[in-house]
């Protein structure tokens, strides 16, 4: 069983992937900095969750 992400985290992640798909990588630390750069999220917890979700989606996109 996996974790269920909140709707706002998914929405932000999908918007980031739509607009900046080629910038994100499979590295969490890089994505964390990019999420900070492209959004106005002030909460560290929310930023990390969005970065983790983006990292997971990018890794799955590159596999297929």
From Swiss-Prot:
A single GO cellular-component term on record: cytosol
GO biological process: translation
Family: Belongs to the eukaryotic ribosomal protein eS17 family.
Keywords, comma-separated and alphabetical: Ribonucleoprotein, Ribosomal protein
Gene Ontology MF terms: structural constituent of ribosome
Protein known as: Small ribosomal subunit protein eS17
This protein's record includes keyword Ribonucleoprotein: yes
